[in-house]
């Protein structure tokens, strides 16, 4: 065989399959097919569904429905009830039903005291907490990265400070509580610097980056392409390079797509009205291979670890896939 790659099944620990509630955007079944076509055999679905995955029963619903799908699907439970940011869910019971981590993804936990409590509870069941790292007051009505390009386009900006301030807070809370903290979709140089510094003294901190933050910079938005309207936003070329360097030196542990499908109506509209998010499961490996292997010269084997063994370790999944008697992926 030529121009073929044999690798362990890829794992994406950050996807949005929209079921229950928005099956017009994606279902577990259609999301599974997208994942499988991209080489993924295992995914973790975020809880911002309708209703959210905030009860043991909702976690069990995902687990049972996932048995009909061609890949492994693991639910991530909501940290707070209805993702309201104030009332903690029954994390222990949800974990017993199969929740592999906890997050209010899409709705950052603004209350530092609540984030502390969530981290403390997570230590009891030894699972990571994943907080969408944006200060909502600093983010305000930002539609893209705040900078020269946003000024030229006349679009409200979302400063990198909105991310880095929240990342710094969460890192401090993780060190204080001794909990496992996973930082999703890192997008800025400042956030990378905070993570790098904390990881030198706290091995329980992990981080991910998306293919689109590695591939694009904010100049790509000059066409007002709503497919590139994501949260956190695609930032400057300096930020993009900092993310690549963070992958190279291990500051960033894995790649996750933040696969977030929408309807055509949600995207084929004006930039200010378009929904945040883009799909990524099917294009992930191609984009990552282009940026990290072809452009940056990383070894393919090391890049595959970012998509397989590293996310397995973050979530505590079985690593031994090839011994006799194990289920190969």
Give the label of every model feature segment.
Residues 3, 14, 35, 39, ...:
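Divalent metal-coordination and catalytic microenvironments
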Residues 4-66:
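Metal-associated gating/positioning segment near the N- to mid-region
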Residues 16-26, 44-56, 76-88, 104-114, ...:
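Divalent metal-binding segments
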Residues 39-44, 70-74, 98-101, 173-181, ...:
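Short, surface-exposed connector motifs at secondary-structure boundaries
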Residues 62-68, 91-96:
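Acidic (Asp/Glu)-rich catalytic clusters
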Residues 64-79:
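A glycine-rich helix N-cap at a beta->alpha junction
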Residues 88-255:
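Histidine/acidic residue-rich metal-binding segments in metalloenzymes
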Residues 152-180, 227, 248, 253-255, ...:
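His/Asp/Glu-enriched, well-ordered alpha-helical/loop segment
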